[in-house]
Amino acid sequence: MDTQDMTAFPHRHLLGIEGLTATDVELILDLADGYVEQNRSPGRKSAILSGLTVVNLFFENSTRTRTSFELAAKRLGGDCINMSSDGSSVKKGESLIDTAMTLNAMHLDVLVVRHQESGAPLLLSSKVNCAVINAGDGAHEHPTQALLDALTIRRHKGTLRGLTVAICGDILHSRVARSNIHLLNIMGARVRVVAPPTLLPGAVDRLGVEVHHSMATGLKDADIVMMLRLQLERMQGQYLPSQREYFRFYGLDYDKLAVARPDALIMHPGPMNRGVEIDSLVADDIHRSVILEQVELGVAVRMACLDLLTRGHRGTGA
């Protein structure tokens, strides 16, 4: 893929959606669009990252995100190393900063970080010489997920501006929700959050969203219905009476979906809890569900991010 005519990215790191402009977002999405087509062609690999090293440093479990970043690096011709906390000296008591500085001494080019503590990627970005990408930090942000969601929506709807997007479920613990709220507001969408009061953060309305406690009102005439899983690993059991009761009121099925627009897209960042936040028939609806397309486009978005953040190492025409 030829990137010589692409604009330089004005940020050294990608730590969150907050702080990006609409121009920044469009730049990433436009570049990712090209990578979607490259990934669908027989010759998927290029040499844009040839000679560069990407390290995935994950302190939380991941299937989609880590594999997606690994594929993205390899399809751009880069070297990729996967590290987890279980396989590192963190298990022996080494601090996060010492781990990062040790990796930095080995002259890596991009550090992709997932950590259970909000702000960990920001801290690391001040200690290393390479680009840092936030792959999810606590309940703070998950920028590449919001970007791939935006690309999925744009490819179906043509634009994000003016769309009504309902984000439903465990908003309180969701970094995906926060990144999507920031991005959708930047791009001119109308954002609703739909959840029981116990699964909403305090002062959520200050984020520029409409707050709904009922799926009937929250999904009314929505263009996009984005479901979130219950993050039980971050709960202590006091947030909801039972998963069955939760599905009755907040699980997406065809009855609840009926109030949304007839062409509304169904989205989910994964992993899904079928029968808890979404019914299997809805999740697998080939006409309305774009859940697997989100996974596909995630690779292209992460390729675009790696491309843009390494241009200072190799020049924009590499």
Curated annotation (Swiss-Prot):
UniProt keyword terms in alphabetical order: Pyrimidine biosynthesis, Transferase
> What are the GO cellular component annotations?
cytosol
**EC nos:** 2.1.3.2
Q: Which InterPro entries match?
A: Asp/Orn_carbamoyltranf_P-bd, Asp/Orn_carbamoylTrfase, Asp/Orn_carbamoylTrfase_sf, Asp_carbamoyltransf, Asp_carbamoyltransf_Asp/Orn-bd
For whether the record's keyword set contains Acetylation, the answer is no
The main enzyme category here is transferase
* GO MF term (any one): aspartate carbamoyltransferase activity
Q: Which reaction does it catalyse?
A: carbamoyl phosphate + L-aspartate = N-carbamoyl-L-aspartate + phosphate + H(+)
Per its UniProt record, what Gene3D superfamilies does this chain match?
Aspartate/ornithine carbamoyltransferase
Highest taxon listed in the record's lineage: Bacteria
Task: Locate the residues binding L-aspartate.
Answer: K92, R175, R229
Q: In which pathway does it act?
A: Pyrimidine metabolism; UMP biosynthesis via de novo pathway; (S)-dihydroorotate from bicarbonate: step 2/3
This chain's function reads:
Catalyzes the condensation of carbamoyl phosphate and aspartate to form carbamoyl aspartate and inorganic phosphate, the committed step in the de novo pyrimidine nucleotide biosynthesis pathway.
PANTHER family reported for this sequence: ASPARTATE CARBAMOYLTRANSFERASE (PTHR45753:SF6), ORNITHINE CARBAMOYLTRANSFERASE, MITOCHONDRIAL (PTHR45753)
Q: What is the name listed in the Swiss-Prot or TrEMBL entry for this protein?
A: Aspartate carbamoyltransferase catalytic subunit
Naturally occurring in which organism (per UniProt): Rhodospirillum centenum (strain ATCC 51521 / SW)
Q: What is the lineage of its organism?
A: Bacteria, Pseudomonadati, Pseudomonadota, Alphaproteobacteria, Rhodospirillales
List the gene name: pyrB
